């Protein structure tokens, strides 16, 4: 089943909307953004989430000890590094936050530079300087995320064949196009912010529900297709 993160959560209301709709994770932006929250806000909002819903703090080039302190205070279950963080940064962060999930955002160009065109060749975990999952996002000179723009899915398709690590797709997703993104890329997870909002920082209940429904419909159809293929191979 596709992992779904609703990012840019700014209130208990929005957290409740995402949780009731079936999100697997909430994202809290701790860097300058229209969706930025304070550590106190993130902690308070996170208390409404049941244990099975992950709480991911999103950081951009934060000082290591500061990030670790915030993550502990907010009781995040994971952190998403959305800046220029290096492999050495990730390794050191793991010593400060042992056992915490680490996600690292990359653009399609950065992803292409990390592997041959023939397929995904990420070093498998548990190497300390490698994140647990890569988040493939669109970026502009003005914004590192939350652009509302998609990237070239066809170009990315060849890079996501048989990945050794999970890949999460973000960038311009909404209920209308997430099915096509899933069919093209078959990622481990999807991440959405602007595509389910009334305006930046305010989630639209209907848009959140429709997005998650679209993902689950794809999952159901994909599972049924796999089941039919399995039965056919047994004949």
Mark where each language-model region is.
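Internal alpha/beta core interface subdomains
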Residues: 165, 176, 182, 187-191
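A short, Lys/Arg-enriched amphipathic alpha-helix followed by its capping loop at the start of a domain
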Residues: 17-23
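Conserved anion-binding
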Residues: 25-34, 40-41, 47-164, 168-169, ...
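Extreme N-terminal starter segment of soluble prokaryotic enzymes
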Residues: 1-4
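Glycine-rich beta-strand-to-loop/alpha-helix junction loops that act as flexible
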Residues: 7, 82, 169-173, 193-196
